[in-house]
Amino acid sequence: MQHLIQGTALALALALSAPARAQGTPVANEQFVPVPSYRVGPYAAAGTSVFGGFIDYMNFINVRDGGINGVKLTWEECETSYTVDKGLPCYEKLKGHPPTGASMFSFYSTAIVYAVLDRAGTDKVPLVTIVHGRTDASDGRVFPYVFPLMTNYWSQNTDIVKFIGMRSGGMDKLKGQKIVHLYLDVAYGKEPNEIFLKQAAMYGFEPKLVPVPPPGTDQQSQWLEIRQFAPDWVIVTGYGVMNPAMLKAAARANYPRDHVIGNFWTGSEEDTIPAGDAAVNYISSLINPAGTDFKIIQDIQKVLYDKGLGNMTDKSRIGSVLYNRGIMTGIITVEAIRTAQGKYGKKPLTGEQTRWGLENLNLDDKRIAQLGATGLIQPLKVTCADHEGGGAVKFQQWDGKKWKIISDWIQPDRKLVRDMVQASAAKYAAEKGITPRDCSKGG
């Protein structure tokens, strides 16, 4: 009896001293996906939605399908607060996570992407920078491990200028107009400036760059400058708390909100609802729409939320623009891993192997329909040379309660964007001593 008591006590002590298997801790036949989220700070409202949707999709695949061809997805969150100081340690902490290292990183922070870009290539860990990150990384010949998928900042800016041209009665009507680019003064906000100025020269409109110091809650001086300039249009590249502050400032300046065009990080419910009436008639681009009518969103609600398994504590945000963007991120992550399994086998894969899956990803209308995501995402075809794979956006307008889509897919100026991407990537390659891949030889 004494031996039994001692044995039980020893077993209990060992159990208590052993670390509990937390969500994301890998075991055999598991695929690890890092989640470098930001749930605190001035960008938390966006981060909780995007990463909540991302986690929900991975959990959905595990619960409904048992993983990807039998390989369970695991993950671990690491709080970046949308800062490089925290983002870099998160990268270093998670990149070598067992059993096979990080599948890919989706930081949703341009500054962090810039900070880890070189080391990710060395470490052979893909960076999936859906609608963010370094634009010239769209040239996969120079940046084999970076994927600015769906659309990049330069493509989107040409979409916005094209939309303004359509609203003005034709691209020739842009000549003589005044257009402001109001942007958060960080790497992300500055990214469109080069092509914005290029398009000003092409179409003859007068440009003005107006930076907003982060986090962007005080814009009094910026809107005084805008009023003095008297622009026909204001393009906004904002994020987080800057966006509702921008809409309120525009209202105080009596500037018509239907002539304020935000980018796809300036067009969510988290931006418009806090601004109240000041947001009515405001327009933004979108890469994915809001809504819960999509089959995939309805399936997630049934499989996860009806059973208390969802990640979002505020269920009213399910189906928001940014939540759905997280679902889109999950779809791309899972389908890239699935594609890579087709080549390397149904087993846990390395970052180098998932990179191949990303570069050979082909989401056509048929596959999107099978995923229940028709209307949620646009077709995506990635190649060795083209790591963007899409480029089109739609536009939406806030009616005071919800977003209404007001355009079809608008295609970017692909020649202009590609010429600039290749020139910038070539300069980077020369500076770093990189020999671009020959895609005719299979990358």
Ranges and model annotations:
Residues 309-323, 334-408:
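Segments of small-molecule ligand-sensing domains
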Residues 24, 30-32, 45-52, 63-140, ...:
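Beta-alpha junction/loop-to-helix N-cap segments that form part of ligand/metal-binding clefts
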Residues 80, 127-129, 135-138, 215, ...:
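Venus flytrap/periplasmic-binding-protein-like
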Residues 94-108, 126-130, 178-183, 230-240, ...:
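Periplasmic-binding protein-like
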Residues 86, 135-136, 144-254, 291-298:
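Extracellular/periplasmic Venus flytrap/periplasmic-binding protein
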Residues 1-32, 427-443:
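Short, low-complexity disordered leader/linker segments with a strong preference
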Residues 42-52, 187-192:
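Glycine- and acidic-residue-enriched helix-capping/strand-helix junction motifs
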Residues 143, 250-330, 410-413, 424:
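Extracellular/periplasmic periplasmic-binding protein-like sensory domains
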